[in-house]
């Protein structure tokens, strides 16, 4: 596993029905799970959450720190494979979920739960997420108080919402409510909020998953109820290519690759279909 990134292992673990359901692959799946657990960051004093990067998971071999997107992928894999260690001696070797929650909120623009100096209560940012503590892919901006804030953006905010779901935070938790409010206030299908067309289809993909998992049927946007399932479905129909595929004109994060983006589309539509 050391030759693979934590991201690759997480995707393979959660995506392989054989690993999850077929007992012939249990040992391999448990080893993959244990590797992901071993990648949880613990800087500073060991077994204490005393650093903003503590509790998260990164690529494992690309750069030496955690980030929210890799943490989401790992949490998803660990959540759906948790039955592999239930009622076994390995149950005590699980992820430190409390530390994971601490890391997630350390990526959230929510001063009530995140005391880092960049966290902003300006409505333009409050409740949304950034990529990792101290860095936003959407850059920075002056908030209403003249302070430099790190800009929340769409796809990573849905990643934060989903991460809270896998950590089993309830819908009425103030951290979940805060990101839901930011996402509702910034709802659009024309762009990935604050990122333009970059990561647009990943934004759709995470949106459908997060809103489905938290059982959200409508969004309130500018005082009006929006049936997000219908709106997202219509946008996918409009953007579909003649050959049935989807593709982003913006190449960032491999979204010019039809197989990847079409997979995002199919999975997103499958979540929409389940909610009908």
Where are these regions (language model features)?
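Single conserved hydrophobic/aromatic residue that forms the stacking wall/gate
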Residues: 1-15, 20
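An alpha-helical repeat/solenoid feature that recognizes helix-turn-helix modules
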Residues: 16-17, 21-34, 38-234, 238, ...
